[in-house]
Amino acid sequence: MIRLPEKIRRPLEKVVRDLSTREDVYGLGLYGSWSRGDAAATSDVDLLVLVKSDIPDEYVERAVAEGLMIDLDFVPMGWFKGPLPAELDHKLFEAQILYDRDWTLTNIKMLMTKAYGSPERVEIRTSVHVVEADIYLSRATSALWKGDHLSARLFASTALEKILKIPLEITLQPISNSHFIEKAEEAAEKLGLRDVFTDFMETAGLNVVDRALAEEKSRLFKSLWDEMHLVVKQHSQTVEKAPFKAKTSLKYYFNSAFMQGVILRATSMVNSETYAEAAHYLEDTFLAMLETYAWLKSTVEKQSVDYTTLMRSIENLEKANPRVHQNAAKLLGLTEVEKAKVDELVKKAKRNIIRLRRERKRLIKTHLSKS
């Protein structure tokens, strides 16, 4: 078990004590960077919270304890009664059990420890990433056909990011939002897929990020969060009446502690001179936030939103405040987009996805069959 610094351990112990008194909470597990031992001083704490109540889906809340940023990841016990969702694999494998009322979390953790690196389980996880990549490639293709070149480029790079998770899974690397580029490069190099990683960096524009650009993206993130938070605050009743997933996502992303944590982490990465990593972290976080915000804005404006043309939809929804669309495009690196160039980027993403889909099982067999 990783020994935590005092400034992390003390507030975390208090949170664990408080949560363990709740009738609904059956297990608590520390996962993520603090569990793995690769956390920075500005890293958030990730806490898996197993609850007995029949919540519709997994969701995350941001909490603050003595200045410590904590993400509480609530998961229903019902998920453990059938086939285990692949998205829980990393969390369970990394988890340090801090509280377990009836041994449910401990038992499922033991099972995952045995199965995690098996070819069969890795095949399950990688198949999920293939589906995710296909979804975003479909979005990119649709956006290109509809003439939204900004969205087409955005989703082409997102599709490549999803397919790069396959090498990460096969090499049993953690999938970390703040170490994605570092780990993806290592994994791609190990599997002879360096060109796939290079294509991702070029498509996403991350190969040209310097300190000035990373710092500008951080400023844009803060500015956009402020603008969007105002809208969320003005329409709090709509948020409360929203479907479960939209409601919990809006409350998470537009919690001031969430924004503060993102800026602190990005600033730390910039100071460590990992500029592309900082840019990717900000862009990836912002895209998830933007999609959630688009739902709220479309509901308030009573306009439909086409997620395949997300950038055009935001432009239409924000006609009264065009700064949101303009700054979003800048933050996501979409300011200079030519049709011919985007067409080639979408084709490049498609080639790489087809390649990884074809080679996936062979790579798993080659690199994991002896495990």
PLM feature segments, named:
Residues 1-26, 31-43, 48-98:
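Metal-dependent nucleotidyltransferase catalytic core
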Residues 9, 103-112, 225, 349, ...:
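Generic hydrophobic, helix-prone segments enriched in Leu/Val/Ile
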Residues 9-16, 98-105, 223-229:
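Short N-terminal helix-initiation segments at or just after the protein's N-terminus
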Residues 15-16, 39, 118-120, 159:
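A short alpha-helix capping/helix-coil boundary motif
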Residues 15-16, 78, 101-107, 150, ...:
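Short, functional N-terminal and low-complexity linear motifs
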Residues 86, 90-139:
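Internal, well-ordered alpha/beta segment that forms a basic, Gly-enriched binding/recognition surface
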Residues 123-371:
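Conserved nucleotidyltransferase catalytic core and NTase-mimicking acidic/glycine-rich helix/loop elements
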